[in-house]
Structure formats: structure tokens, C-alpha cells
């Protein structure tokens, strides 16, 4: 069965970037560029007129910036939006805010046709553009509405909770290993923010995200939870009460190593080949922890396209760990958890808002 052609609109104030993205997307037989726009205001007019299947939207533009444009799209003309973002703290922060507004995913701004990474970047841009069209916009809107309903009292409680964190310990009773892709940033904010400060577990996360963005995402998540959240670095010791997020463009695996005369489990980062088009890979993390932690593991496979995580989940299950797959009812894209369910690997299939409670029951 032939796939329907996906109609894409590019909104970016740089003529060079519009041309590069047009050339990249045009190489995919399932994608067709129906128009380009040079700023947010121009983009809104073309969205109303052309009704694209997906919009690629620059986050920083004159006249009408990316966030204002995104807010209008979400409210007036719901369409999957993939943000185009450069590196830099301001650009990364705007992009993370865009996820709260309703963006589906983010792509790295292509730097030029001579870039050595252009083939990989082009493949990722096309893949994320295709995946965005499968997003459940109703679930995105429901998550957005819940976030906007949060009161100032709730926010103050989160800050106080954050200040009263418990001490971390390298004695690990349980490991929560989480994999997510499209729709993952908002899902992770909700899930990790629901964990109690004294949860008896170390938390390891692979979120498919470009290099550079995971550092900003880690800082943002750290400010919204009672747990310590950081982007993983080579040699980080696995500790209860700490959340390690795999850095973009690096696989994160857990290995055993002697540290100051004591055997510890630590993070090992590598740039070995991508798996299923992704680096970091959920499978790589799950495979590495299975023989080390065995029945101490609870692996969660959240929203995302394709099937990363299923092979690794099989290894975890063989070693006695538990598997939780996100239910279709709360997924932005029901791909990764769907494969886990299809292969009958899931011990639990739960909507996002029921996961934290079940996890606490399992590990207590």
C-alpha cells in the first residue's frame, strides 16, 4: 500500500535555510514542499491558505516569532509543528518552551551543504517530519491544558519540594530505565515530576533529541522535580535519587568499574553507530543494564515513532525486570510502546498519569 504524500510548509527567515530544507525534504518521495514563508506572519497566511500536513517552524524570527506563531497554530489551525532550532542557550530554551506550547518535535538547523554530518542530518529531518504527521494532537492539547491549569500554589510547592531533596546514594535498590522519542519531553516532565522525593531508585533516560538540547532539557527538568536531574557524563556513578539523561548524539550504557577501590556502576558514553536511526538508543541502554541489575529494573517505553526499546525490553524481561508500555490513549505517537505490546513484552500498559503510582507500588 502506497503512503500518502505529506505536504510540508517551511517557515524560516533565512533564505538559505529554506532552500536547504526544501532540498532535503524533496529527496524523500513521501514528502512534498507546498510552500515556504519568510517570517511568522507570512507563515500564518500560508497555513490558512495551504492547510499543510506539517509545519517546520524556525524558533527565532522577526515580525512574529516562533512561539507566537506556534501558539496561533495550536489554537486556530491545529497542525503538527516541528521546530527548527540552532544551538545556543536562548534558542534551546525557546525550543523547550515550544514543547509546552504544543510542538511535536525539534530538528537541528542545518548549517550548510558542506557539513560532514549532512547525510545523517537529512535522514533525521525527513524521519521527524514524517513522524510528526502521526502525532495525536488531541493528546498534545490535553497535556498543554493541564500544564496551563497549574496554579501558583502548585508551582511554589514544586520549588519547596525541589529544595528539600534527599541525599543520593550509590547503593541502588531499583533502576527505572525510560525511553522516549516524539512527544517525550512533555511526557517526561509530567512523569518525573510525579515521582516522590524519596523514590528508592536510580533513573536513567534516553530521549531522542539533538546534541546540545539534552543539556538544556536536563536543567529544565531538574527545576521541576524533587530529584536531581543532569545530563550524563562519562563515569557518572549510578545513584538513587539521581536522574541521568543520555546526551544527544551519544549512546549511554551502564558498565561496572572500580572507583576508589570500590566496584560501582557508571555511565559510559559512546559515538558507536546509530541503532534504528537513533543515537542515543533506548535499546543500547536497556541491553547494558539487563545483566547488571536484572530483577531490580523497571523499564518504561513511552511515546515515540518506530520500535526503539523493544529489543532491549526483551533482554530486560529475560533477566527478570518489569516492562511498562505507555497506553495509546496518552501517547503523542503510538509507535515504540506499540511494538512492545505487540511482542507481548509489557507487564503493564498504562496511560501516563497512572505510571508513577504503579511504579511506586512495584519498587516499594
UniProtKB/Swiss-Prot annotation:
Pfam families noted in UniProt: CheB_methylest (PF01339), Response_reg (PF00072)
PTM annotation: Phosphorylated by CheA. Phosphorylation of the N-terminal regulatory domain activates the methylesterase activity.
Residue intervals of the CheB-type methylesterase domain: 167-364
GO CC entries: cytoplasm
Protein name: Protein-glutamate methylesterase/protein-glutamine glutaminase
Residue numbers of 4-aspartylphosphate PTMs: 58
Cell compartment(s), UniProt: Cytoplasm
Source superkingdom: Archaea
Taxonomic classification: Archaea, Methanobacteriati, Methanobacteriota, Stenosarchaea group, Methanomicrobia
Keywords tagged on the record: Chemotaxis, Cytoplasm, Hydrolase, Phosphoprotein
Organism: Methanosarcina barkeri (strain Fusaro / DSM 804)
Residues annotated as domain Response regulatory: 7-124
Domain notes: Contains a C-terminal catalytic domain, and an N-terminal region which modulates catalytic activity.
InterPro entries, alphabetized: CheB-like, CheB_C, CheY-like_superfamily, Sig_transdc_resp-reg_Me-estase, Sig_transdc_resp-reg_receiver
Catalytic activity: [protein]-L-glutamate 5-O-methyl ester + H2O = L-glutamyl-[protein] + methanol + H(+); L-glutaminyl-[protein] + H2O = L-glutamyl-[protein] + NH4(+)
Gene from which this protein is expressed: cheB
Stated family: Belongs to the CheB family.
HAMAP family per UniProt: CheB_chemtxs
Active site: 181, 208, 308
